[in-house]
Amino acid sequence: MSNDKDSFNVSDLTAALKDEDRAGLVNALKNKLQNLAGQRSDVLENLTPNVRKRVDALRDIQSQHDELEAKFREERAILEAKYQTLYQPLYVKRYEIVNGTTEVELAPEDDTKVDQGEEKTAEEKGVPSFWLTALKNNDVISEEVTERDEGALKYLKDIKWCKIEEPKGFKLEFFFDTNPYFKNTVLTKSYHMIDEDEPLLEKAMGTEIDWYPGKCLTQKILKKKPKKGSKNTKPITKLEDCESFFNFFSPPEVPDEDEDIDEERAEDLQNLMEQDYDIGSTIREKIIPRAVSWFTGEAMEAEDFEIDDDEEDDIDEDEDEEDEEDEEDDDDEDEEESKTKKKPSIGNKKGGRSQIVGEGKQDERPPECKQQ
């Protein structure tokens, strides 16, 4: 076990993350690298010359691997940018259909069905509640959407994302139609990453929502009756924060560097930041690319199928382990039973042992197979 000096100090890194200019983070990482360098030199010095030569060869191979990986990341970024450009016309078509600016022509057989009995609704354009339904069908997002939120999310026209180059990260954009809840037409959420290839979040920033009076969904009004005999007969009103999807645009705030926070609060803050990033990455990686599949529920069924497969594999492994344990228990019971029935004599070890094994196998049965 390494000593405390050489071990990675999470609190140091957390403290460093509080500094917006990242100077503290750089120092923390430098200290960590220095510790690692010291450990590495100790390991190398303890090697024999022949082993040291082999390790040096392995390090050369690792360097070649790192060069290829850097090239892979560079080419991947170019490829991703290329396909993001190719996706855009498809997203535009999706937007037009969802919001009714483009009408899809019915196939002849579908048109006949409408003429035979179904009424055409002139007012209904596009696909109502498209994004609301897509968001609610995802397990991660649905936990954030309350019944009060649904009225506002019905006005959601589109969701887009784009990369941020400086600082590295990505931005989500939520486009809303004119609605009775807030004045904003676009709500944004930006994630600034310390390392784009690793999910190491520096901070998140969201749009301040300009709510109409009495329409704020992130707060609720509590009314309390005045005490008996009080001169003030009017109910006492109080605003209280409440759960809402729109809290997503007010991400957790990291305390100032000089502010002391206890371990429990720091852990709660870390959990909130991880949850917030999970929501953002889910919208970016799952909802936006496959919105119609989430709307229809097909994406949800596909995820459930994958989860079921994983659970079935876990069950099979557990049952295999249980079967092995049952076999071991049966063997132990048979051995104890045989010893009780007849003990081998010292003068006839071979014959005695053979007899015990034979008696043990007479009543032995294979363990039941719980699942084929």
Swiss-Prot record:
It is found in: Nucleus; Cytoplasm. One of its GO terms (molecular function) is identical protein binding. Ubiquitous. A motif (Nuclear export signal) lies at residues 47-62. Residues 300-337 have a biased composition (Acidic residues). It comes from the Eukaryota. Induction: By brassinosteroids. The keyword Cell inner membrane does not apply. Residues 370-372 form a propeptide. The keyword Coiled coil applies. A motif (Nuclear localization signal) lies at residues 223-228. Residues 360-372 have a biased composition (Basic and acidic residues). GO terms for cellular component: cytoplasm; cytosol; nucleus. Prenylation of the protein is required for its function during the cell proliferation phase of leaf development. Keywords: Chaperone, Coiled coil, Cytoplasm, Lipoprotein, Methylation, Nucleus, Phosphoprotein, Prenylation. The modification Cysteine methyl ester is found at C369. Its main location: nucleus. GO terms for biological process: cell differentiation; cell population proliferation; DNA repair; double-strand break repair via homologous recombination; nucleosome assembly; somatic cell DNA recombination. InterPro entries: NAP-like_sf, NAP_family. Residues 26-80 form a coiled coil. Triple mutant nap1;1-nap1;2-nap1;3 has no obvious visible phenotype but exhibits hypersensitivity to DNA damage after UV-radiation, affected transcription of NER related genes, slight hypersensitive response to abscisic acid (ABA) in seedling growth and impaired somatic homologous recombination. May modulate chromatin structure by regulation of nucleosome assembly/disassembly. Contributes to the regulation of cell proliferation and cell expansion. May function in nucleotide excision repair (NER). Involved in somatic homologous recombination. The acidic domain is probably involved in the interaction with histones. This is Nucleosome assembly protein 1;1. It comes from Arabidopsis thaliana (Mouse-ear cress). The gene is NAP1;1.
